[in-house]
From Swiss-Prot:
Homooctamer; tetramer of dimers. Its EC number is 2.6.99.2. GO terms for biological process: pyridoxine biosynthetic process. Its main location: cytoplasm. This is Pyridoxine 5'-phosphate synthase.
Length: 240
């Protein structure tokens, strides 16, 4: 199972003071050295963390691959066509949210998403859709031509009781099986950390987990390379 390291919150810390540090590009290179299989960045409409310059620099220096998260807007579509990342993940986005709060409603806007997927695919990118583990959304993702999906694990991460955790984990298990059964590459992420990742990493059929906030938080105490290496070891062991 692959580990995609999201470096958005390295940029969050930088933007909090408007400084040039910490540098998310350095974090990305350190993550690669520590075993990351790819680097994920989300260029938001409000530019609250990652900036265009970060994406341009990362495209030039990464040894692995970039997973570029973006909202379905003309501005982002044009930027993605210019940058041409290896992977593009379409996500829902509102200015008021602290972080992405739910999956993209593909079923409710199939024509719009289909047009975006087709346009972005012409850049050579593998396009994925960030969706809830819901059969209706998974089927819609296949219909619009996306080769990959990323299942939103936030409800699992936020579950408080053992019963809720088990229910949300089962929802992910079923979503993965349904997606794989429909010929899709299935990734997952959101809210995963060192104490809840193993159960998800043990699910057969998941191609990649994308993790960011927990890594950046842990790196404050152990360093970025150590934080990434520790997470990678947990995922590899659980997915055997």
């Amino acid at each position: 199972m692959l580990l995609g390291v999201n470096i958005d919150h390295v940029a969050t810390l930088r933007q909090a003071r408007g400084t040039r540090y910490p540098d998310p590009v350095k974090a990305a290179l350190d993550a690669e050295e520590a075993g990351a299989d790819g680097i994920t960045v989300h260029l938001r409409e409000d530019r609250r963390h990652i900036q265009e310059r970060d994406v341009v620099l990362l495209k030039d220096v990464l040894q692995t691959r970039m997973n570029f998260e973006m909202g379905v807007t003309e501005e982002m579509m044009a930027f993605a066509e210019k940058i041409r990342p290896a992977h593009i993940c379409l996500v829902p986005e509102t200015r008021q949210e602290l972080t992405t709060e739910g999956g993209l409603d593909v079923a409710g806007q199939e024509a719009r998403i289909k047009a975006a997927v087709e346009r972005l695919a012409r850049t050579g990118a593998e396009v994925s859709l960030f969706i809830d583990a819901d059969e209706r959304q998974i089927e819609a993702s296949r219909r619009v031509g996306a080769p990959a999906i990323e299942l939103h694990t936030g409800r699992y991460a936020d579950a408080e009781t053992p019963t809720e955790v088990a229910e949300e984990l089962q929802r992910i298990v079923e979503g993965v099986a349904f997606g794989v059964g429909h010929g899709l590459i299935v990734n997952a992420g959101h809210g995963l950390h060192y104490h809840n990742v193993e159960a998800v990493a043990a699910i057969k059929g998941i191609n990649e987990l994308n993790i960011g906030h927990a890594l950046v938080a842990h790196a404050l105490f152990v360093g970025f390379k150590a934080a990434v290496a520790e997470m990678k070891a947990l995922i590899v062991a659980a997915s055997r």
